[in-house]
Amino acid sequence: MGQTSCNALSDRLIVIKELVDRGLDPEGTHTILGLMGINAPDTATLAGVKLYSEYLPKAAEKPYTDEQRYLQFLWDSLEHAPLAPATNFAFPFRRIIAQRLFLHCGKNFCAEAIRFNLGQNISAGDDVFINAGTYIDAKGGVTLGNAVGIGEWVRIFTHTHSESDHAERTYAPVVIGDYAKVYSGAMILPGVTIGEQAIVAGGAVVTKDVPPNAVVAGIPAQVIRQRKTEGRCREQLNHTWLYDGAFQDE
């Protein structure tokens, strides 16, 4: 019975991937919502959907395509689906969406319940893992290197507002280097680059660049020491996120 249930989830994911790879329209989106266990609105209603991000200035500069709109809609809809707690459905589902929506999405991408705007401005390398509750403001562009780990409730921002004129915005990209780790509750501010293999401690507010292999903590974040690598680097650091490398087998 258990194996049959797993096969049923796999079969749904196969159909979802085929529909996504074909290019989403209201009909395909309606079908996928049903496969997610959601009582989907009719296709005419789906055709009129507008996302929050489409009311942002950056979206006015480069409007969403219909496909991008439906991909983002499906990503956000998953958290309201009966199958959302089923990790063996939710992880592959998000990967399917990210590989089509993101500017780039490498192999073995893993994400729990996270939110972002303008997913088309996110680039993720291989073996990226993002924990639940994280929010990515991608208006200015976000690049996540290979084997980056991001903890729960991390916030990444790429824009600010003028204090004297709220409508005046400044954008600056965030880059997190290969094998860096950002622990729970940290905040990364616009324009920051976090170096390879660096660690951002939980709750830190990062306002300036972090050197490679540095450990930073505090508000604002300051270098407190070097990462204890014991001579290891990159793959030797064994950024295997779940037991027995689950979902890192592409």
Language-model segments: residues:
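Terminal amphipathic alpha-helical/low-complexity segments used for targeting or macromolecular assembly
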Residues: M1-R100, T229-E250
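Structural signal for interior beta-strand "rungs" in well-ordered beta-sheet cores
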Residues: H104-C105, F109-I224
